[in-house]
């Protein structure tokens, strides 16, 4: 099967076969990252603009390297140094990029739905690199890829997503992707950081970490978004660490071959203990490598075979 | 577009004999197996390369390294194709440095696949020499590329299609010429 969408805005609504196509395409891409010459000519002459309205190290660099490894021309725009500060609207910025012949716009925005709005107004293909607390589809895909690589499958696994689900776009993309692929999803965190609507999506919700970890195959630890914790949603960081921090002792409740993920950047000693983050059963660095492979796969699938008249 | 069988070019025995002859030619041209390696172009080049490896093993008593090359990422027509090709793994589990590499494919036509394969190989390592072995050369080259070893030369028209079938992929061995019918 071929990629049939103009844009990649979220994992919600993607079919199982579409997710499988991306994951299968990412495997040979990962080989390229491991070579001495990390470059293939696949996207020569194509242009990719990374339009970032929020700070990012790994996602932006990952997209930029993915494009460069495939010989595309990549340009980074940080909103702070663009015409956004002069009051230009998102749609006008998009139209400007369109007029310059941009093939793909990778956008990160603090407002949920911003990539959807942009996609409606530009000819360029749009990839959501994180919108507010909505979705972060490429992070979700790299998490799925990492789990499948380590466990050999996704179907039938129990995955516990631990921490600040309320503010997490990573959690939402994980939930949609994992459920589509047939995994059982558990959410765990302080009740103030668990959005009630997620309980109706078919996931199990826990407020006691011990119960959430019981027999889990995978634990995906979310970053405690300290910059968003001024609303008093939990008393102190110390108390959070004591109640919900993942440590070796708590991990004993999981399956013996448990896999630990973290989208980074980590608050060591808060949501995850040092000796957990650096253990062999954690794949945190591997997630970063896999992120480049998955993004290469997405760029390939979005740009290859455009003669098919791909649709929204 | 339909394809109608026109003639059988090679049966299983003919393919086996062609592989045997090419194996001898490879050994003769390279004066043995020192630094020799075989790399098949996916898909049908890979089983043909494997058969060449087995034949060389039979003749020389030594196994030469075998790799598989996927050239999808090196094609120059990706964004104009209607159907997106699926990418498979490239597996070259040995160093190409200093090797005499024999690239193996089923059909040589425009030469674009071989050009892509040459680019792909050179990105993986720096062989001493690259040679080309094909089961069928049907002509119509669009690039200055020539095979070193050919199982069978078949002059064709552009409205004809050469179909090579191998046991490992298609469940039978054979090569036939087909007509494109609108």
From Swiss-Prot, chain A:
Pathway: Pyrimidine metabolism; UMP biosynthesis via de novo pathway; (S)-dihydroorotate from bicarbonate: step 2/3. GO terms for biological process: 'de novo' pyrimidine nucleobase biosynthetic process; 'de novo' UMP biosynthetic process; amino acid metabolic process. Keywords: Pyrimidine biosynthesis, Transferase. GO terms for molecular function: amino acid binding; aspartate carbamoyltransferase activity. It is an enzyme of class 2 (transferase). InterPro entries: Asp/Orn_carbamoyltranf_P-bd (IPR006132), Asp/Orn_carbamoylTrfase (IPR006130), Asp/Orn_carbamoylTrfase_sf (IPR036901), Asp_carbamoyltransf (IPR002082), Asp_carbamoyltransf_Asp/Orn-bd (IPR006131). Gene3D superfamilies: Aspartate/ornithine carbamoyltransferase. It catalyses: carbamoyl phosphate + L-aspartate = N-carbamoyl-L-aspartate + phosphate + H(+). GO terms for cellular component: cytosol. This is Aspartate carbamoyltransferase catalytic subunit.
């Amino acid at each position: 099967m071929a990629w049939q969408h103009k844009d990649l805005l979220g994992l919600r609504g993607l079919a199982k076969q579409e997710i499988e196509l991306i994951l299968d395409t990412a495997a040979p891409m990962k080989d390229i990252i491991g070579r001495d010459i990390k470059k293939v000519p696949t996207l020569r002459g194509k242009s990719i603009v990374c339009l970032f309205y929020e700070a990012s190290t790994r996602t932006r660099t990952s997209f930029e390297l993915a494009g460069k490894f495939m010989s595309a021309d990549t340009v980074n725009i940080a909103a702070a140094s663009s015409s956004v500060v002069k009051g230009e609207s998102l749609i006008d910025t998009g139209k400007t990029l369109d007029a310059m012949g941009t093939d793909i716009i990778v956008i990160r925005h603090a407002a949920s739905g911003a990539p959807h709005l942009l996609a409606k107004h530009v000819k360029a293909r749009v990839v959501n690199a994180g919108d507010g607390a909505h979705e972060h589809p490429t992070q979700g895909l790299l998490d799925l890829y990492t789990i499948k690589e380590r466990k050999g499958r996704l179907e039938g696994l129990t995955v516990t997503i631990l921490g600040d689900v309320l503010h997490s776009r990573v959690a939402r993309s994980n939930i949609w992707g994992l459920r589509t692929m047939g995994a059982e999803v558990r959410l765990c965190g302080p009740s103030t950081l668990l959005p009630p609507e997620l309980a109706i999506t078919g996931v199990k919700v826990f407020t006691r970490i011990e119960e959430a970890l019981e027999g889990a195959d995978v634990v995906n630890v979310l970053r405690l978004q300290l910059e968003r914790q001024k609303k008093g949603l939990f008393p102190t960081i110390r108390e959070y660490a004591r109640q919900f921090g993942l440590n070796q002792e708590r991990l004993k409740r999981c399956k013996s071959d448990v896999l630990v993920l973290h989208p980074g950047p980590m608050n060591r000693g808060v949501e995850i203990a040092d000796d957990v983050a650096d253990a062999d059963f954690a794949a945190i660095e591997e997630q970063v490598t896999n992120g480049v492979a998955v993004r290469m796969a997405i760029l390939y699938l979005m740009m290859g075979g455009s003669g098919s008249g791909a649709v929204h | 577009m339909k394809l109608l069988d026109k003639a059988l070019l090679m049966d299983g025995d003919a393919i086996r004999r062609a592989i045997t002859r090419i194996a001898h030619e490879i050994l003769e041209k390279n004066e043995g197996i020192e630094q020799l390696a075989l790399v098949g172009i996916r898909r049908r080049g890979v089983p043909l390369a494997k058969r060449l490896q087995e034949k060389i093993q039979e003749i020389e008593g030594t196994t030469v390294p075998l790799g598989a090359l996927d050239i999808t990422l090196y094609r120059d027509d990706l964004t104009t194709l209607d159907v997106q090709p699926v990418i498979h793994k490239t597996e070259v589990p040995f160093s190409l440095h200093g090797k005499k590499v024999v690239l193996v494919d089923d059909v040589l036509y425009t030469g674009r696949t071989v050009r892509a394969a040459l680019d792909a190989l050179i990105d993986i390592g720096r062989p001493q020499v690259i040679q080309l072995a094909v089961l069928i050369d049907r002509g119509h080259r669009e690039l200055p590329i020539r095979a070193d070893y050919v199982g069978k030369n078949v002059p064709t028209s552009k409205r004809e299609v050469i179909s090579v079938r191998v046991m490992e992929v298609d469940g039978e061995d054979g090569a036939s010429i087909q007509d494109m019918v609108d």
